[in-house]
């Protein structure tokens, strides 16, 4: 069976930092680091992924590349006295994924457009880059396209801020195949349950409760 162009593009992007792609990605990252955090580009870097997510080379579709800083939250260190453990500056990660953060920043930059989807394009030691597909819901070419005209309806306004994109649904644990397991919310609930079960202060009233009661409180 003859394989098309998109198949070979996808194969290259499975290992973007190996072989001939390594030199190309190095040149791209050097250039991208000097650019603004949010920049509009003419064509998608990953054509196969963009087309799979609904992109079309026609009026009304816009591609934006967004740079997001890697890592957890950058909390300001308190200047009042407390234990270092209670400072609240380390170990706090956002509940949103970096991809969803990139989508929201692109939507704020272009408030008249709607976010269709996004995909990963690269990273270095400090940043990650995503390309966000934006759609103009008021453009005639979009409103008359049977594949994408659903986004022109009023219930899809500001959809990225309501967790209705693919990244937003993943963050909310709405994947049909996996459900809540292994999502950020699942890990948070599991950690809360571990904290309640752990007897850190034997003198406290809750430390001597049976584990069945503690587990029931955690589920509530």
Swiss-Prot record:
Q: Does the keyword Ribosomal protein apply?
A: yes
Q: Which UniProt keywords apply?
A: Ribonucleoprotein, Ribosomal protein
Tell me which SMART domains the record gives. Answer: Ribosomal_L15e
Q: Which domain of life is it from?
A: Archaea
Gene Ontology cellular-component terms for this entry are:
cytosolic large ribosomal subunit
The family database entries (SUPFAM superfamilies) matched by this protein are listed as: Ribosomal proteins S24e, L23 and L15e
Q: Which family does it belong to?
A: Belongs to the eukaryotic ribosomal protein eL15 family.
The protein depicted here goes by the name Large ribosomal subunit protein eL15
Natural source organism: Staphylothermus marinus (strain ATCC 43588 / DSM 3639 / JCM 9404 / F1)
